[in-house]
Amino acid sequence: MLNIVMIGCGAIGAGVLELLENDPQLRVDAVIVPRDSETQVRHRLASLRRPPRVLSALPAGERPDLLVECAGHRAIEQHVLPALAQGIPCLVVSVGALSEPGLVERLEAAAQAGGSRIELLPGAIGAIDALSAARVGGLESVRYTGRKPASAWLGTPGETVCDLQRLEKARVIFDGSAREAARLYPKNANVAATLSLAGLGLDRTQVRLIADPESCENVHQVEASGAFGGFELTLRGKPLAANPKTSALTVYSVVRALGNHAHAISI
């Protein structure tokens, strides 16, 4: 059985814990949350058949088989970098954080120093394998369009573009590079950043973000072309009830990645 420590226990982390309840090969031994949230999270997880320990930091000398980040961008700095340097392999959900200048290089250096490895999870998007394979032969263009319910953009710069609460028809709230999208919309940047890292990079990947009052799904569209030919992907993801900014597929992506580490055959 893999010994797993998870950073964060919000909508994504809680969903992962629930799905792992009946998997005999996978167990989250501990979750790491801010100190002032420990009691609340411990109470919330008490109903699980196998509740994990709730900690504010990884105890000195403790070496789990895997550390899984489900907590947002700050957790990369606080927990993932030190874990990699200590030789602990890490899975990362908050790929948008890697748009920060120099962070990719720091993560790579920490992993090399510790002899460990970092795996970036696809989360809410698919076709990452096809995109990264196409890059080998030469990519020419990659465009990502993200369409979400208007309410999912509350608390973002989209509020300065239009009145999201009174929006009557779909409105483009951003059109530019993936790097700029990640800077302005960090909580919605994971898909764009993942596509960029797999393909043409943050500056050459084009991003369009749309607020749609008639949509009840998070719709991700990817168009790519190059020496390989081209492809178009449309993925309609149901948002998590606990967080409309996040697709439920993100939770399933984490569980799938953990299964690939635990089981004899992975795909």
Curated annotation (Swiss-Prot):
The keyword Oxidoreductase applies. Its EC number is 1.4.1.21. InterPro entries: Asp/hSer_DH_NAD-bd, Asp_DH, Asp_DH_prok, L-Asp_DH, NAD(P)-bd_dom_sf. One of its GO terms (molecular function) is NAD binding. Keywords: NAD, NADP, Oxidoreductase, Pyridine nucleotide biosynthesis. The active site is at 220. It is an enzyme of class 1 (oxidoreductase). The keyword Cytoplasm does not apply. NAD(+) binds at residues 124, 190. Pathway: Cofactor biosynthesis; NAD(+) biosynthesis; iminoaspartate from L-aspartate (dehydrogenase route): step 1/1. One of its GO terms (biological process) is NAD biosynthetic process. Pfam families: Asp_DH_C, NAD_binding_3. It catalyses: L-aspartate + NADP(+) + H2O = oxaloacetate + NH4(+) + NADPH + H(+); L-aspartate + NAD(+) + H2O = oxaloacetate + NH4(+) + NADH + H(+). Belongs to the L-aspartate dehydrogenase family. Specifically catalyzes the NAD or NADP-dependent dehydrogenation of L-aspartate to iminoaspartate. The iminoaspartate product is unstable in aqueous solution and can decompose to oxaloacetate and ammonia. This is L-aspartate dehydrogenase. It comes from Pseudomonas aeruginosa (strain ATCC 15692 / DSM 22644 / CIP 104116 / JCM 14847 / LMG 12228 / 1C / PRS 101 / PAO1). The lineage of its organism: Bacteria, Pseudomonadati, Pseudomonadota, Gammaproteobacteria, Pseudomonadales. The gene is nadX.
